[in-house]
Amino acid sequence: STVDAEMRYGLKYVEEQEILFGDGTGAHLEGIMPQASKYKAAFEVAMQNGIDDLRLAMLQAQLARFPATGHVLHFIDWAKIELIKDTLGRYILANPAALTGPTLWGLPVVATESSAFLGKFLTGAFSAGAQLFDREEANVVISTENADDFEKNMISIRCEERVALAVKRPEAFV
């Protein structure tokens, strides 16, 4: 149903925010970003740009003994990278006719709409550095027996899941 789909979509959005940015207080997860290592380039690159930053973040993770497996970027930042052109106006990375998924330096890129990611990135060894425990998958429950819903001719809808996040190796993320 539409209600079920909307509730699950909203829950997944909140889950993404918690996994990435949760502050660990109360019922909040302790997200990856607050625990990640601060980006520190091992060396400077001439005319350094976002593409260079992501490669240097991969190096930083590698030097911490956790080879990166992916990047997370805001939609706008990823579009800026894809639209970089050479002096002849040719796209450096993107091939508008290609049907391949987004990748950079051989790693998948996950673009997010989270406004907190604008101008930032997360590069890391996602499979080795963190683990998501999913105790209860998303479920939607509809009830008329909540408090006085029956008398008021109302229904209550709840969508929830139970997850925990263990960032076992914070140094695996930059």
Region locations from a protein language model:
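Structured, hydrophobic secondary-structure cores that serve as assembly/anchoring elements
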Residues: 1-174
